[in-house]
């Protein structure tokens, strides 16, 4: 929707709230969805190859494991809701994913030599992700940052696939 602006800059109008929500969803939210899930697939694939199928128990900080178990329990205790996924990685936040990659960067480096730059880039979208995830309007610079990280991550995934790195869905 070209010309849609943050509804909070105007006199209240429910139609503006709807338009702003549609704009953020169509322009930004889906890219964050893709970023987080591509990172999950890459982390799972690389750590499975480097550590083994039990990589979560071996390579993830116990604090993150405990947080994920609490989140998983929230869903288990409310079985009438859908769940994020079967693997624990789907219960990890973007900040958790970054910490997992940081702690295991030596295992990522053979496959993604510039992993430190990727960690920094994920950190650049963490706060804008929270803004969008909590249904607020991102700043133009944040939208551009998300656009660039999304496009570059798509390229990285294509490069990994072309290099023979097996990418598998957790």
Region annotations inferred by a language model:
Residues 1-170:
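Amphipathic alpha-helical interface elements
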């Amino acid at each position: 929707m070209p010309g849609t602006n943050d509804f909070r800059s105007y006199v209240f109008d429910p139609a503006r709230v709807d338009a702003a929500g549609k704009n953020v969803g169509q322009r930004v939210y889906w890219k964050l969805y893709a970023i987080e899930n591509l990172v999950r697939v890459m982390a799972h694939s690389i750590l499975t190859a480097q550590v083994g199928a039990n990589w979560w128990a071996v390579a993830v900080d116990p604090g993150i494991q405990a947080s994920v178990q609490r989140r998983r329990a929230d869903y288990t205790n409310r079985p009438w809701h859908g769940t994020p996924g079967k693997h624990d990685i789907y219960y990890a936040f973007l900040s958790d994913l970054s910490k997992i990659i940081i702690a295991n960067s030596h295992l990522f480096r053979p496959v993604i030599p510039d992993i430190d730059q990727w960690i920094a880039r994920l950190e650049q979208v963490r706060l804008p992700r929270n803004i969008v995830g909590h249904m607020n309007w991102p700043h133009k610079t944040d939208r551009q940052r998300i656009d660039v990280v999304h496009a570059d991550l798509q390229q990285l995934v294509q490069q990994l696939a072309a290099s023979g790195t097996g990418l598998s869905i957790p």
